């Protein structure tokens, strides 16, 4: 009879089993959270009420029942000293009881989770793809996300080195240029970027022989379209043209670099980005002082970005050269020396001979003619032009009178 009744009972499906397991797991998780809240509540109440009772008892004993003898005082103070130890013991007992309940709850929770994991593995092996997908979406969304993340390939993040370009662009022709003459089948067209030098074809016609076919077959095009992660024909090439106007600072900086930047007053927060006005590309960063006066050529579209302001120039100072002054004074001295007669030049020598013969033992007498000679030599170049001017004026007066 029991066998017949057992046959009539239907076996629960996997969905029903998973639903019951989910319900039990949620109940256990709620019980664990509730248990932790109760532990905090009971411990807090114990400490609060025990401390309040302890203070009231101490006050009552001190003012009402505190005896005068020291022996009686010690006996009365013993319960007051033992009460804090009793409260700490009760606190440890509460923590121990609640921790035991939490451990039992965690054991049951782990058992239910292992049962659920086994059922899900059986579902993935036995059920169809559609049913398995629905069950996983409903009862195990985390494993589904992990499976999708493992299925989709992740491209490695390439960090550029200091000497490499951060990004590489291949700018297509935005407007059709002028129509050129018919080209030979062996040559490749040139692409010109706005504002910069022409860019060679990506296929590299110089490296391929003249008879080789440069057009891709339809099968190669289909393979490239099916694989989105395959590199393009010119992805490994460096775009021609000038480098960046200013170096781009590294994004990952250490503590020492930040301290140095703070002391020096340099860093990304103290710089402005150089953005191209045509293609809006990042061309490095410039200091605040030179940002308004920097003119740069874009490294991607080769457009010349003019400076926002012109740097003010200070007025030019007059040049002073000591050599020019000496050169300007030298013709006057030469002309004055040429006008001197040989008699005048020999006169100081005769005076020196006379003074030395007259007083040979007096050094002061020897120095005096020398000083007089130097004074006469300095005064002669100034007196000679004045005498010439007077002679010319007298000659003019005589001519007018005649």
Swiss-Prot record:
- State its location(s): Endoplasmic reticulum membrane
Query: Which residues span the membrane?
Result: 46-66, 78-98
What GO biological process term is on the record, naming one? endoplasmic reticulum tubular network organization
Q: Where is the composition biased (Basic and acidic residues)?
A: 321-330, 385-402
Any ranges marked Cytoplasmic in the topology annotation, and which?
Answer: 1-45, 99-402
Modifications after synthesis and translation: Phosphorylated. Phosphorylation occurs during interphase. Phosphorylation also occurs during mitosis; these phosphorylations reduce both its homodimerization and the ER three-way tubular junction formation.
Q: Which GO terms describe its molecular function?
A: identical protein binding; zinc ion binding
Superkingdom of the source?
Answer: Eukaryota
| GO CC terms, sorted | endoplasmic reticulum membrane; endoplasmic reticulum tubular network; endoplasmic reticulum tubular network membrane
Would I find Zinc among this entry's keywords?
A: yes
Which residue ranges have biased composition labelled Acidic residues?
A: 341-352
Q: What is known of its domains?
A: The transmembrane domain 1 and 2 function as a signal-anchor and stop-transfer sequence, respectively, generating a double-spanning integral membrane protein with a N- and C-terminal cytoplasmic orientation. Transmembrane domain 1 and 2 are probably sufficient to mediate membrane translocation and topology formation in a N-myristoylation-independent manner. Transmembrane domain 2 is sufficient to block the protein secretion pathway. The two coiled-coil domains are necessary for its endoplasmic reticulum (ER) three-way tubular junction localization.
The entry sums up its family as follows: Belongs to the lunapark family.
**Protein name per the record:** Endoplasmic reticulum junction formation protein lunapark-B
Q: What taxonomic ancestry is recorded?
A: Eukaryota, Metazoa, Chordata, Craniata, Vertebrata
Gene label:
lnpkb
